[in-house]
Amino acid sequence: MSCPVIELTQQLIRRPSLSPDDAGCQALLIERLQAIGFTVERMDFADTQNFWAWRGQGETLAFAGHTDVVPPGDADRWINPPFEPTIRDGMLFGRGAADMKGSLAAMVVAAERFVAQHPNHTGRLAFLITSDEEASAHNGTVKAVEALMARNERLDYCLVGEPSSIEVVGDVVKNGRRGSLTCNLTIHGVQGHVAYPHLADNPVHRAAPFLNELVAIEWDQGNEFFPATSMQIANIQAGTGSNNVIPGELFVQFNFRFSTELTDEMIKAQVLALLEKHQLRYTVDWWLSGQPFLTARGKLVDAVVNAVEHYNEIKPQLLTTGGTSDGRFIARMGAQVVELGPVNATIHKINECVNAADLQLLARMYQRIMEQLVA
């Protein structure tokens, strides 16, 4: 028996949409949405394709996602070519099956079924889709959100189809994400010969006490919704490669994944105070890739929990763990934001796959969420 969710997922996988190349995925989605009465606005920026689609008016529920995928790696290591979808033992294999073409297909099919049953729905149903989530994300959802905010576009609820589940679909729902702040720090010294240290100033030696103190800081203890803030050193570089040269500079890159207990400005102030305490000469560059956000219990979370309980007979965990997602941009619009998608065990891996039955279940969950919020 054919399944429209599986068929659409396979059509999307066949389009090798390596970020930010959409490879025709959005045209396929747009065609399906326009056929059921959606108005579609393309919002392309530079090399990235985005679209905003809506049907109806009033309180707005948007489904958000991305058509782009990460590179497949060594195609010879796949059980089947990564862009030729295949089903084995109930599992659908292909790059993007779980992240997140399966979710996109489930969203669109859910919308088709919802509109067929509720042609005069009272709220507004919308889609916000990008082709740049996996790469730089500079011209994707963030730019589309800026354009929507500039004209005071309404967005009350947003469901992001990222693969949130761990073992079975719906066992985990993400109702927030930690913030992410990266520090690119250069400590300046004076290069010289290792035999004449009095004529040089070793930045590695200078920075060692600072780094020791930095890694020992307990930034916070988290809260009911977030784990404690984490700081990790990601890269350290110094020296010329020669064993007789004292380096002139030390580069250190470290990243904070921070909770709502802190702001990026609080973190910056503490790091800068520590640098001054240790009397270091430095230059610093900060990159804030996302503020923390949280959607507490409310209409959207309740609708999502209800849908999962109805179709999978489990109570989902509400978590804020993991990396960042495009939900961080959408939250700026004041919307309640939740992530619900398939099992994430194989995302970005060789032989990425998803349980085909899970995608059918996901489409039913999405439809029930629509029925609770905008019918």
Swiss-Prot record:
Zn(2+) 1 binds at residues 66, 99, 162. Keywords: Amino-acid biosynthesis, Cobalt, Diaminopimelate biosynthesis, Hydrolase, Lysine biosynthesis, Metal-binding, Zinc. Binds 2 Zn(2+) or Co(2+) ions per subunit. Its EC number is 3.5.1.18. It catalyses: N-succinyl-(2S,6S)-2,6-diaminopimelate + H2O = (2S,6S)-2,6-diaminopimelate + succinate. It comes from the Bacteria. One of its GO terms (biological process) is L-arginine biosynthetic process. Transmembrane segments: none annotated. Pathway: Amino-acid biosynthesis; L-lysine biosynthesis via DAP pathway; LL-2,6-diaminopimelate from (S)-tetrahydrodipicolinate (succinylase route): step 3/3. InterPro entries: ArgE/DapE_CS, Bact_exopeptidase_dim_dom, DapE_proteobac, Peptidase_M20, Peptidase_M20_dimer, Peptidase_M20A. It holds the Pfam family M20_dimer. SUPFAM superfamilies: Bacterial exopeptidase dimerisation domain (SSF55031), Zn-dependent exopeptidases (SSF53187). One of its GO terms (molecular function) is cobalt ion binding. It is an enzyme of class 3 (hydrolase). Its cofactor is Zn(2+); Co(2+). Zn(2+) 2 binds at residues 99, 134, 348. The active site is at residues 68, 133. NCBIfam families: dapE_proteo, PRK13009.1. Homodimer. Catalyzes the hydrolysis of N-succinyl-L,L-diaminopimelic acid (SDAP), forming succinate and LL-2,6-diaminopimelate (DAP), an intermediate involved in the bacterial biosynthesis of lysine and meso-diaminopimelic acid, an essential component of bacterial cell walls. Belongs to the peptidase M20A family. DapE subfamily. This is Succinyl-diaminopimelate desuccinylase. It comes from Escherichia coli O157:H7. The gene is dapE.
